[in-house]
């Protein structure tokens, strides 16, 4: 409904601000350790179904950054004098793992050539040279890259990109035309999960899926366990 009436955008904005207020602005000061004057999170090793670390009290893995209001929350975290915060992240690790697991020749070639994978995806989907890719096209390709490998639906992609469903469907179709072995791998993963009742990571961790045969689309997301474990 976003875009069809101005009140919808206002409601969504209100929800976002209410989330920031309740989860961060009001809650974070209450979690400051009185002795150290700092916030100390807890990292959990055996809580998530995928095997990934999670964080609680507070969840420091989920401090907002996607919009300007969220970025203001991050400004509340200040290092000690003489110290700095830094972050390290693998470059597009989920896509690299997907390229390895699926053996998709086009994606592997893009990584081997050192291409910007999002620009390379946009170039192939929109059938233009990589130097002609616009910022908007790259942004859409980035959203598609990370959404599609986790089983995002046409509706979900349309909502995330704020486009109509026709454009979202064309993007997904173009994506799988560009990376056909990824589509094949994803379909095989779902079939395998339905047959054995679980998904197994590269390192042998099993995630059992008792509702794998339901019609719920969340099944598509759960079969992505191999990517994010």
Please provide the spans of the model-predicted regions.
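Conserved catalytic core of nucleotide polymerization and phosphodiester-bond processing enzymes
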Residues: 1-229
């Amino acid at each position: 409904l976003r875009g069809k009436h101005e009140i919808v955008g206002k409601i969504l904005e209100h929800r976002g601000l209410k989330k920031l207020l309740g989860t961060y602005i009001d809650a974070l000061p209450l979690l400051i350790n009185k002795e150290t004057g700092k916030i100390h999170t807890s990292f959990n090793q055996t809580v998530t179904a995928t095997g990934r670390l999670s964080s609680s009290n507070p969840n420091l893995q989920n401090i907002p950054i996607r919009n300007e209001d969220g970025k203001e929350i991050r400004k509340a975290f200040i290092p000690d004098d003489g110290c700095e915060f830094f972050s390290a992240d693998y470059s597009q690790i989920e896509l690299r793992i997907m390229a390895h697991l699926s053996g998709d020749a086009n994606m592997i070639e893009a990584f081997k050539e050192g291409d910007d994978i999002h620009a390379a995806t946009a170039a192939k989907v929109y059938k233009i040279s990589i130097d002609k890719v616009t910022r908007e096209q790259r942004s859409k390709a980035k959203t598609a890259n990370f959404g599609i490998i986790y089983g995002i639906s046409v509706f979900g992609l349309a909502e995330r990109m704020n486009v109509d469903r026709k454009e979202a469907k064309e993007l997904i179709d173009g994506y799988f035309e560009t990376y056909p072995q990824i589509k094949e791998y994803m379909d095989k993963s779902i079939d395998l999960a339905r047959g054995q009742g679980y998904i197994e990571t590269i390192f042998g961790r099993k995630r059992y899926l008792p509702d794998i045969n339901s019609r719920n689309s969340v099944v598509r997301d759960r079969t992505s366990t191999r990517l994010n474990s």
